[in-house]
Amino acid sequence: GALSNGALTLGDASYKFNDGHFSGTVNAANFNTTSDATLKTNVETLTGSLDAVKSLRGVSFDWLENGNSEVGVIAQEVEAVLPDVVSTNAEGIKSVKYGNMVAVLIEAMKEQQLRIEALELKLGE
């Protein structure tokens, strides 16, 4: 419900808000994503992340709905490379889980760093 300070609450600690759609901008100090090891199984380090990132395209675009300019990626293009970071709703509209892409970027950066260090060693010889 609405609070006196203008904030909006959705349920309470026992209520879990699973799905939602917001058109426009949502501002918050932080969005926390549950990531506790005790809630996970079959944990494996990602491989091939650098190749995946290299095949992605960052784009600028205007939203059809309101004409606002943005930058981002195209969900269909991401889905072709990283299907686990794309969701499709009941109407067939695709969404990118940008937060989940961080793990891919971390591993891609580590792969790139290994390549840089190997080249530095060659140059030092």
List PLM regions with ranges.
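C-terminal intramolecular chaperone/autoprocessing and neck/assembly modules of extracellular spikes
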Residues: 1-98, 115-125
